[in-house]
Amino acid sequence: MAAAGAASNPGGGPEMVRGQAFDVGPRYINLAYIGEGAYGMVCSAHDNVNKVRVAIKKISPFEHQTYCQRTLREIKILLRFKHENIIGINDIIRAPTIEQMKDVYIVQDLMETDLYKLLKTQHLSNDHICYFLYQILRGLKYIHSANVLHRDLKPSNLLLNTTCDLKICDFGLARVADPDHDHTGFLTEYVATRWYRAPEIMLNSKGYTKSIDIWSVGCILAEMLSNRPIFPGKHYLDQLNHILGILGSPSQEDLNCIINLKARNYLLSLPHKNKVPWNRLFPNADPKALDLLDKMLTFNPHKRIEVEAALAHPYLEQYYDPSDEPVAEAPFKFEMELDDLPKETLKELIFEETARFQPGY
């Protein structure tokens, strides 16, 4: 009987893990179950070539346009990015023909845990909070320098290993920044995880500007300080109410930035709220951490701190080194917007994008 979570491979075909075939041999062997993603299973495996254990994500996206889109975005972006604080793609395994391709296996560095799991079990020291925040912002500086927005930064998308290295993952919702087309109506549905969503997403923004990611990093910093999410909204408007309950009512100047009248009138209809002092919410926190938190969790996206200024903030001074905070070689361009392409076309693009890993390529 195979151990729980271990793989069985009696006949030399694909290894089976919890009833799922993992067709990744002969290079990758000794599979062990790690967890389940939105559209696939993740296992660790031994890499026979590099003699290390790696993570392998099995993705089966081809039945759904949205899953194809996210898979293609993730692959396109991660193959072009190269940075210590962003998870890379080491290898991609798929069938040799498009007709046979039902799954895609993405091989990445094995990271022991993520910030979500860590915060469920550990109180972080100020030193750990400072070092994790520095690495998040160092990775984000590179992402933003490529003119890309992550748009789904949250603790479970920050991978960690035992030496406290941090890598940002999951670029399935990423976009090229497009401030000129950021405006939308009041309460348009938005996909990223609600608790880490900036207030303008609820009001009048598509989340196409870099300030959207900075807000999420502020939410993550607050969560590291207290081991609980700062704005755990139960639904769309509740999310906004949580934010205003701590930040207080927006100023007239901040209201003037909200072009959408429905959104502005909604805010004006709410009773006045005072800002809650950060040191009352986080009495044990380093005052410098709270100063940076305040600059990230700023209601008005135009006044929110940018990533370079955040890195240069006194709280991160022991790590700050602009000469060791690399930027992307060139801004990222999606030749085409993927949103409207049919899944058959997206499958062809995924097939092409992964060809470089095929034997004899």
UniProtKB/Swiss-Prot annotation:
Q: Where in this chain does the record put each Protein kinase domain?
A: 28-316
Q: In which tissues is it expressed?
A: Expressed in the central nervous system, kidney, liver, intestine and the hematopoietic system. Also found in heart, muscle, pancreas and lung.
Q: SUPFAM superfamilies under this entry?
A: Protein kinase-like (PK-like) (SSF56112)
State if rRNA-binding is listed as a keyword: no
Compartments, record wording = Cytoplasm, Cytoskeleton, Microtubule organizing center, Centrosome; Cytoplasm; Cytoplasm, Cytoskeleton, Spindle
Residue list for modification Phosphotyrosine: 190
Q: What keywords does the record list, in alphabetical order?
A: Apoptosis, ATP-binding, Cell cycle, Cytoplasm, Cytoskeleton, Kinase, Nucleotide-binding, Phosphoprotein, Serine/threonine-protein kinase, Transferase
What positions does UniProt annotate as the active site of this protein?
A: 152 (proton acceptor)
* Chain positions with Phosphothreonine modification: 188
What Pfam family does this protein match (any one)?
Pkinase
| Known cofactor(s) | Mg(2+)
Listed PANTHER family: MITOGEN-ACTIVATED PROTEIN KINASE
Annotated family: Belongs to the protein kinase superfamily. CMGC Ser/Thr protein kinase family. MAP kinase subfamily.
Q: What is this protein called?
A: Mitogen-activated protein kinase 1
- The organism encoding this protein is Xenopus laevis (African clawed frog)
